[in-house]
């Protein structure tokens, strides 16, 4: 029996016409709309029945499997929650409840959710008190995965292994954005029970907003070397994440990763959150930090940062400051047209080795710079010159270059990260990098005492510092930056993409002989890469040989996720070494290395590592063929 249609002139009939056939391109979009819609009408609805997309066979094949995380359901029936109606009479047949309902279905094109049917005529008046008591914003999103009350309660707190297991037990559906991240954290705790992890969920939604973590070994490293901290932030990573890494500088002048923070794009006050979480994880370092070098965003959070680190000088990374200044000049319309030499003048300003040199460069900027940009510079950067000019730098008297340390870490980071847009895969890569950095404690130092960690940075000492000074004075910072210059890694990303087509980072295991052949090929590539004494990969392998008890076996496979379970004896070494040929090609493409330089490095490194004659001849032959 068909239900009677309400008269078109009534309010309910008009609302039904407006709601029917309305489309939504994600379940989260529908949930936000429905929360506001219910609040306007004081209406209470709950999910009576539903069909999850994970049960549809056609949705499990790529690329349609992404629909599971976005649309979540193929069918949902929402009915009115008439709280005053008796649930079931003691005697007699059950009484009919409120007839109001809404049906949402997947569209025939399978790209959106559509309201196909609705009846908004209720059998009871609306009650504001009942609505205020029973209504829970975001309850539709909670039904998709986790209860909102649970995520709101645990958000912004450090979680223990038991908390992660409890969250996994609460999960109701296959929301891979949450499930995969929780599985990675569960594996991390299984491998390192002393790790520190803080989770932040979007308010009233079961959506991960921020993850902060550090392992027990990097926390010990931070407590050992807290004097100088560096912050490397990569906004818009893969177009889907913001990444912030806190580095410490060890006794040999190497930048070592201490903690990481992964967040949704545009998350406010990420630096303050990361520093506060870091100090909560290691409170004894608060009064021992003497210098913090971060990006230009630190200026907007300066009072909070100084409150967190009262004994530290706060600096702006000169390289990032220069890019920010030049981008602002382009925005104001002066760079390249009114003043084509602006980039060189900015480099001389930032690299001034004395107050006199700074005043001279500033006078030149006033004389030749665009008026709008000079006014902006005087208001925003000149009062803070102690934070970004070289002669006032904290590390200048210690023969260190914070900018070079940050650049070196960023290169290593971009080589390690796979081109995945998910939080879970990013966490896997970052945990692997922290383990690799921790393994560097056992790496023998090179002749210059710098070890393999500053492979691409100018040498320390007077000669290296003089080279950096000459580069600043001549404006040789790799050329004027263009839009998106921070992401000069197109070649690297292409190589990673090709590698992913065969490795299948999305979760598929290696299949039969094809997978084993790929492993053997990558292992051989790793053997050739091992002949580079100044490379990060070689340092990790040597360190891993000395620390087999910490870095091998099923413990490492646990947190790496199910897609790597087929690798029986690889451990962390296999993770770090796979694709090293691709990474080396990407690094040469990024930094301008030539094949001839790489071949000379291979020959020199073979003598340092005392490799076998067989390995040397094979490496030389392969490099000659490539060339």
UniProtKB/Swiss-Prot annotation:
Q: Which InterPro entries match?
A: DUF5575_C, DUF5575_N, ZSWIM9, ZSWIM9_RNaseH-like
Q: Which domain of life is it from?
A: Eukaryota
Q: Ranges of Basic and acidic residues compositional bias? A: 615-627
Q: What is the lineage of its organism?
A: Eukaryota, Metazoa, Chordata, Craniata, Vertebrata
Cystines in this chain: none
- Residue ranges annotated as coiled coil are none
PANTHER family hit by this protein: BTB DOMAIN-CONTAINING PROTEIN, ZINC FINGER SWIM-TYPE CONTAINING 9
> What keywords tag this UniProt record?
Isopeptide bond, Ubl conjugation
Name recorded for this polypeptide:
Uncharacterized protein ZSWIM9
